[in-house]
Amino acid sequence: MLKVLMACVWLLGSAYGAIAQAASVVFLNPGRSSETFWVSYAQFMQAGAKDLGLDLRVRYSERDNQVTLAHAREALLGTGRPDYLVLVNEQYVAPQIMRMAQGSGVKLLIVNNALTPDQTQLLDAYHDTRLIGSMVADDEQAGYLMLTDLLRQHGPIASGATLDLLAFSGAKTTPAAQLREQGLRRALAEHPQVRLRQLVYGEWNRQRAYEQATQMLKRYPQSALVWSANDEMALGAMQALQDSGRVPGKDVLFSAVNSSPQILAARLDGRLSTLVAGHFTLGGWAMVLIHDEAKGVDIGALGGRNRQQALFQLIEVAQARRLMGPMRSVEFRALSAVGKPPSYRYPFSLQLLLR
């Protein structure tokens, strides 16, 4: 009996130890707690953490960098520090957080907006910061895809004719917005018949884009195409066009990034001609990397420490309808590299949710 009791105690202790040793993660979410993209991003991240046995806490900054830094200070300098801190280099905030992290013992993973080349040069100054890597989506390709697909939807342009384009970028100090702009300009270089009449920074905000578009559409009434770096700005610009008595998808063709219910509905009813999405999954895939790193996997050997994932894809009507419905559950544990051969590469893709 004593042996049985001792065995039970040992088993219970082992189970408790496994729970106690579950890697803890804090995610510094740069968005608002009411912002569809960042909420869905965190939800997918939580699903990954739950499946992988990670303890994840999400801290929303409500689009305020000072709040982000306060949350970082609490996580890195307070009691009960996490094993990992996941952050976004929104408005170039990463170096300040890396400075705080020196000597904390907390490992950092950067997602969505990686370090800029200038910031990367500062890494040697943070020699005691445990940065395990970064993972971003192919934002430049997203910007490129939007314009090239808009032109495909528009159809042939008569010889000697031109098309006027209006563009809404995000925030000047957000690397993802800059990269999407670069993709736009690459597409423009390939299609000189398209004239970019004006590019403005809508700060990812619907109301701001609505106000900007109201003036831009008056200034450039012949505009045929609108390129938008996210869904909120596209919806604001669409409303401005509708208020002028014109019809989105007929009089002017719109494009957008993201997969919120409202923008998916616009894709389904034809108001939106081109939609690119997929990067809301980044946080979930980051959980797989953290799980594996905590298990001793050299994640750098499986695609590099700083990885760019080809996550963006054009969302056709059938796919938009699929994304509007209940999402297919993802077996995150099956994506882990634990126990896989050295040749294994993470198959991160939106297709895991669509098939």
Task: For the regions a language model picked out, list residue spans one by one.
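Extracytoplasmic "Venus flytrap"
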Residues: 24-44, 48-49, 57-71, 88-92, ...
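Periplasmic-binding protein-like
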Residues: 26-28, 79-89, 107-112, 166-167, ...
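Short, solvent-exposed amphipathic alpha-helices that sit
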Residues: 36-52, 142-149, 175-194, 212, ...
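Short, well-structured alpha-helical segments in soluble
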Residues: 67-83, 92, 99, 210-222
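Hydrophobic alpha-helical segments within soluble ligand-binding/sensing domains
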Residues: 68, 133-163, 209, 259, ...
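Flexible loop/hinge segments that line or gate small-molecule binding clefts
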Residues: 99-141, 263-264
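Venus flytrap/periplasmic-binding-protein-like
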Residues: 108-120, 228-272, 281
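Hinge/cleft segment of the Venus flytrap/periplasmic-binding protein
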Residues: 168, 285-355
